[in-house]
Amino acid sequence: YTLLCHTTSTSPISTVTCPSGENLCYTKMWCDAFCSSRGKVIELGCVATCPQPKPYEEVTCCSTDKCNPHPKQRPG
């Protein structure tokens, strides 16, 4: 079984089948220079272990198919 996660490595955002061994989807958010006008930068993808957030990052991980939708998009 391989997990399906949303990913921001493609444009527009798409769903990818995670490689073997990467059994978590993650969402990582942080502010860059354009945060006040564009909002937080959002990165989505697959990981083997949930990354440790840096002090300025928010990281969430989950383990079900497509469980990491873009926060501004409705799951679909």
Swiss-Prot record:
Q: Which UniProt keywords apply?
A: Acetylcholine receptor inhibiting toxin, Disulfide bond, Ion channel impairing toxin, Neurotoxin, Postsynaptic neurotoxin, Secreted, Signal, Toxin
Q: In which tissues is it expressed?
A: Expressed by the venom gland.
Primary location class:
secreted
Which positions carry the signal peptide feature in this UniProt record? 1-2
- Would you name any one GO CC term? extracellular region
Pfam families, per this entry?
A: Toxin_cobra-type
- Tell me which Gene3D superfamilies the record gives: CD59
Where in the chain are disulfide-linked cysteines found?
Answer: C5-C25, C18-C46, C31-C35, C50-C61, C62-C67
The terms under GO molecular function for this entry are:
acetylcholine receptor inhibitor activity; ion channel regulator activity; toxin activity
Subcellular location per the Swiss-Prot or TrEMBL entry: Secreted
Assembly notes:
Monomer in solution, homodimer in crystal state.
Instruction: Please explain the role this protein plays, according to its UniProt record.
Output: Binds with high affinity to muscular (alpha-1/CHRNA1) and neuronal (alpha-7/CHRNA7) nicotinic acetylcholine receptor (nAChR) and inhibits acetylcholine from binding to the receptor, thereby impairing neuromuscular and neuronal transmission.
Q: Would you identify the family this protein belongs to, as annotated?
A: Belongs to the three-finger toxin family. Long-chain subfamily. Type II alpha-neurotoxin sub-subfamily.
Q: What is this protein called?
A: Alpha-delta-bungarotoxin-4
Q: Which organism is it from?
A: Bungarus caeruleus (Indian krait)
